[in-house]
Design a protein with these regions (language model features):
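Residue-level detector of beta-strand structural context in well-folded domains
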Residues: 70, 102, 115-116, 198, ...
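Well-ordered mid-protein domain cores that form the structural environment of catalytic cofactors
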Residues: 93-123, 127-144
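A short, hydrophobic C-terminal helix/tail in secreted or cell-surface proteins
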Residues: 399-403
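Acidic, proline/glycine-enriched N-terminal capping motif
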Residues: 1-105, 110-112
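Short coil/turn segments at secondary-structure boundaries
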Residues: 70, 74, 112, 128-132, ...
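N-terminal glycine-rich flavin-associated loop
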Residues: 64-78, 118-126, 166-168
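Conserved, structured C-terminal
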Residues: 1-29, 35-37, 42-45, 121-123, ...
Length: 403
């Protein structure tokens, strides 16, 4: 029947699924989707592949299928007010043709999800959510409009299946897009600044949406086309990326790039983290009310001894460590310790393993202090140093300021 096996929990694929496989992708399940994990060359291992892919993105350009992100069309005269209520940061002054990174909180003040919203017109937005939380966010928005804010004139529609998206990232990403759009002036720095949004055409008269958004810290763009044009878009972008010795990159390389920059994902935003814990408190508006704004100020969530996002280096740079490691003081290696490691990767940029995680008191309390990572599952311990979560210098800054 429908309650067992694949009928109960179907796998979803992006419109480029077969294209990715034909170009060597090894797939992995993420939020019910099959996504490219890595693209091995010859006898490369997973580690070989993602390190090469991440290095290529930093040096030239890479293309990544991001279609699995949730996509929601928000339309109506009260759309801006609606976004201003659900996001912790301000949206009332976001201009048409700009995107903004936003963070949604639950009623209890804990982070629910993060993503970007693009203002396409005065009363129209294109929202992206994380892959894993897309259905939850969609249901949440519908619930708010149907039960709390019935006076708002807003329509929300899931368009996740209608749009196919890729990230084009790296120093040569603009050159690649220049060769792929009908009008190369569209993606110049003046016409498409950081967090800028535009609607244009790819060669072949393919309508598309482009935003200058970076998840890796490099110059990067997100490009969306109607799903029917997905493979044509991939052919066009890949043909031009190869001219700059670019690569296709998967989820593992994407993870390495984001850990180097200190960007959070579901590994960090696991349902018990506040916006302050994630080091994003400056994004919380002080000039408006929003979902979770009152509850996030509760004493238990503002405690100075809460676990705060930090970066981790092994004291011995030749050592490796794992996500799930418990962080302890040297003379008190027991129990739940003082923190935890949520994400690890080998950093091609730094040449050693790095991690993101949380520690009580945060960077201010433990900066450059040697702590111990206890990994009872693997029966190992290692010495760790607490560093800034932004482990390589940020190249671009966000305009997601308080309105």
């Amino acid at each position: 029947g429908r309650n067992v096996g694949k009928h109960f929990r179907p796998l979803r694929v992006t419109p480029m699924h077969q294209w990715n496989i034909d170009h060597g992708a090894k797939m992995i399940e993420v939020g019910l989707y099959q996504r490219p994990w890595y693209y091995p060359k010859e006898n490369e291992t997973l580690s070989d592949s993602y390190i090469r892919e991440a290095s290529t993105v930093r040096k030239t350009v890479g293309i990544c299928d991001v279609t699995s992100l949730g996509k929601i069309a928000i339309q109506g005269p009260d759309s801006t007010e609606f976004l201003n209520r659900i996001y912790s940061n301000g949206f009332s002054k976001l201009q048409v043709g700009k995107a903004r990174y936003g963070i949604m909180l639950r009623d209890d003040g804990i982070v629910m999800d993060d993503g970007t919203s693009w203002r396409l017109a005065e009363n129209e937005y294109f929202m992206t959510t994380s892959t894993g939380e897309a259905a939850k966010v969609m249901s949440w928005l519908e619930e708010l409009l149907q039960t709390r804010w019935t006076d708002l004139n807003v329509n929300v529609t899931s368009v996740s299946e209608q749009w196919a998206g890729v990230s084009v990232a790296g120093p040569k990403s603009r050159e690649v897009l220049n060769n792929c759009v009908d009008d190369s002036l569209v993606v110049t720095n003046n016409n498409l600044p950081f967090m800028g949004v535009t609607s244009t055409f790819l060669k072949g008269n393919i309508p598309c949406r482009i935003a200058r958004i970076s998840f890796s810290g490099e110059l990067a763009f997100e490009v969306y086309v109607k799903s029917d044009f997905a493979n044509t878009m991939m052919d066009l972008l890949w043909e031009n990326a190869k001219k700059y010795d670019g690569c296709l990159y998967g989820l593992e390389a994407l993870g390495a790039l984001r850990v180097e920059k200190g960007h959070v994902t579901a590994a960090e935003l696991d349902g018990r983290v506040t916006i302050d814990d994630a080091g994003l408190s400056k994004m919380a508006s002080t000039k408006k009310s929003y979902i979770g704004s009152a509850m996030r100020k509760r004493g238990v969530l503002k405690n100075n001894d809460r676990e705060i996002l930090v970066g981790f280096f092994p004291t011995n740079l030749k050592e490796t460590f794992n996500a799930g490691t418990i962080v302890c003081e040297k003379n008190n290696i027991k129990g739940q310790g003082i923190g935890r490691i949520t994400s690890v990767t080998y950093s091609p940029e730094l040449g050693h393993w790095i991690g993101l995680g949380f520690v009580k008191g945060g960077l201010d309390k433990w900066k450059d202090t040697n702590l111990v990572g206890a990994d009872p599952v693997r029966n190992k311990q290692m010495n760790l140093k607490v560093v800034s979560p932004h482990m390589i210098c940020l190249l671009y800054t966000s305009d997601a300021a308080d309105d």
